[in-house]
């Protein structure tokens, strides 16, 4: 009998992204192949300029790679035209960035519902789900608060709820704790990790704070556009986490 093939929610194959500059061709992402399963939370780390943010933008279907494949649920994002990539982004990808980009004049629940509204999926079930998700994130009493009436950590939780509300296959986070103090950062990432596992999403978080890797299943390290190391065991990951505490 043959061995069953693993079906990953996300798989990239030899992804390359180059830019032309006055000094020549810049290789921002250099032959990166990775896989993330449903229900797996992965951290992407590396020094400034390592290519991790460019890679995340490619995975979010915001940038097209120069070459390579990006398979999301088996569909190649790299071959899509701009219109189809926008549709894919709305339907299958959730993302939250360092700046949470909440609409300042919408309440917490309205900000979360906005993603469903954009997808023409805002019905009674969607409205109930938005409230339940915010309550799960500890914001049950903040549903009608505007962003300016919430702390940075609370705003980031609203952004997480918005990223998850439309049941995406892939959830991406770019430095979600950069503006938070350590205690709130831990709370946000621990909650985010729990939801990724609980809901069976594939999750990737870019972070400069190695301490936040405590809550992930694997750590992928980039340098000079290349994927140079993968930390898979708890001992390896906690060694990396502890190095960030010094």
Residue ranges and their predicted role:
Residues 8-215, 219-222:
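ABC family nucleotide-binding domain
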């Amino acid at each position: 009998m043959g061995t069953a093939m693993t079906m990953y929610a996300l798989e990239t194959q030899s992804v390359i992204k180059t830019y032309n500059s006055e000094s020549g061709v810049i290789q921002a992402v250099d032959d990166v192949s990775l896989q993330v399963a449903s229900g797996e939370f992965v951290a992407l780390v590396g020094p400034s300029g390592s290519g991790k943010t460019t890679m995340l933008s490619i995975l979010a279907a915001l940038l097209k790679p120069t070459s390579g494949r990006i398979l999301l649920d088996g569909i190649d994002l790299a071959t899509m035209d701009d219109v189809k990539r926008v549709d894919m982004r709305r339907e299958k990808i959730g993302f939250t960035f360092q700046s949470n980009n909440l609409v300042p004049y919408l309440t917490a629940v309205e900000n979360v519902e906005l993603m469903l509204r954009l997808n023409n999926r805002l019905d009674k079930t969607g409205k109930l789900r938005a409230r339940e998700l915010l309550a799960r994130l500890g914001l049950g009493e903040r549903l009608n608060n505007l962003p300016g009436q919430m702390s940075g950590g609370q705003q980031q939780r609203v952004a997480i709820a918005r990223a998850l509300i439309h049941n995406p296959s892939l959830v991406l986070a770019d430095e979600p704790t950069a503006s938070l103090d350590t205690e709130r950062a831990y709370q946000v990432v621990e909650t985010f990790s729990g939801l990724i596992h609980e809901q069976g999403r594939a999750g990737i978080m870019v972070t400069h704070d190695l301490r936040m890797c405590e809550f992930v299943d694997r750590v992928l390290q980039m340098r000079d556009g290349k994927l140079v190391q993968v930390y898979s065991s708890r001992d390896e990951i906690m060694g990396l986490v502890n190095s960030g505490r010094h």
